[in-house]
Amino acid sequence: MDPEGLALLLPPATLATLADSWLREDCPGLNPVALVTGAAPSQAVLWAKSPGVLAGRPFFDAIFAQVNCQVSWFLPEGSKLVPVAKVAEVQGPAHCLLLGERVALNMLARCSGVASAAATAVETARGTGWAGHVAGTRKTTPGFRLVEKYGLLVGGATSHRYDLGGLVMVKDNHVVAAGGVEQAVQGARRAANFALKVEVECSSLQEALEAAEAGADLVLLDNFRPEELHPTAAALKAQFPTVGVEASGGVTLDNLPQFCGPHIDVISLGMLTQAAPALDFSLKLFAEGTTPVPYARKS
């Protein structure tokens, strides 16, 4: 999907609510430094100072809309950033522009970091000739999930289930609580009715076969070493060819190619949201009639 079109997935009211909550977290009361800057009309340039994938424009826009500033973009969503890149310009009252600065930069750095990691993972997987889905997980930052899931999509990965309601996923603890794989899948099928798929986390071929026999749509082979993963997936597919197979647990950008194989449909990586390095952005004010520069001016 074109990254520019992904903004349509984000409800405007949700964007505004998130932006408002982030700004209130940073400034819940008085803003003393506003008396230093004043309210004169000002402009600043957003610079990208590290390579990666640009992601998070709708959230950036929403943050500055909350503080009465306007953003003009020079690069589209999903752009490959080559530092130092001039990404956007922000205009508005000085105290408002600086009120939104750090919140907007934090969000953009994090979202772009996730997108960059996702893009690297997808490129790595495709380089092996594998055509399955590279996915994130539900291992996201509380209160920041929408940003991170959106970043995955911009990077070309799939977001996996957005929340508990997107898929009935039976994990190891659910199996213990239900009294076994078959009982857990039966309960999951009742909960899923016709609208949701059921996925079961399995730690052995025996569990995987039991889950598929009980009616699971997908089987998650968790924490399998590659040399165990592929024979297990092949044996499962031989008996249940329509069951989807997901590999997860211990997958990194370095060892990802080892998990790609003809019987694996999905590979999910928690590190895409948990360990992706943030990109480096800065927002620099400049005086009317001067040339914007990406670093602090020297006197």
UniProtKB/Swiss-Prot annotation:
Q: In which pathway does it act?
A: Cofactor biosynthesis; NAD(+) biosynthesis; nicotinate D-ribonucleotide from quinolinate: step 1/1
Q: Which organism is it from?
A: Sus scrofa (Pig)
| Chain's role | Involved in the catabolism of quinolinic acid (QA).
Catalysed reaction(s)? Answer: nicotinate beta-D-ribonucleotide + CO2 + diphosphate = quinolinate + 5-phospho-alpha-D-ribose 1-diphosphate + 2 H(+)
One GO molecular-function annotation for this sequence? nucleotide binding
Q: Quote the cellular component terms of the Gene Ontology held in the record.
A: cytoplasm
Q: What class of enzyme is it?
A: transferase
Q: Which PANTHER family match?
A: NICOTINATE-NUCLEOTIDE PYROPHOSPHORYLASE [CARBOXYLATING]
Q: Pfam families under this entry?
A: QRPTase_C (PF01729), QRPTase_N (PF02749)
Taxonomic superkingdom? Eukaryota
Which InterPro entries does UniProt cross-reference here?
Aldolase_TIM, NadC, NadC/ModD, Nicotinate_pribotase-like_C, Quinolinate_PRibosylTase_N_sf, Quinolinate_PRibosylTrfase_C, Quinolinate_PRibosylTrfase_N
UniProt-listed GO biological process terms = NAD biosynthetic process; quinolinate catabolic process
Quick one: where's region Important for hexamer formation?
A: 8-12
Q: Under which name does UniProt file this protein?
A: Nicotinate-nucleotide pyrophosphorylase [carboxylating]
**Enzyme Commission identifier(s):** 2.4.2.19
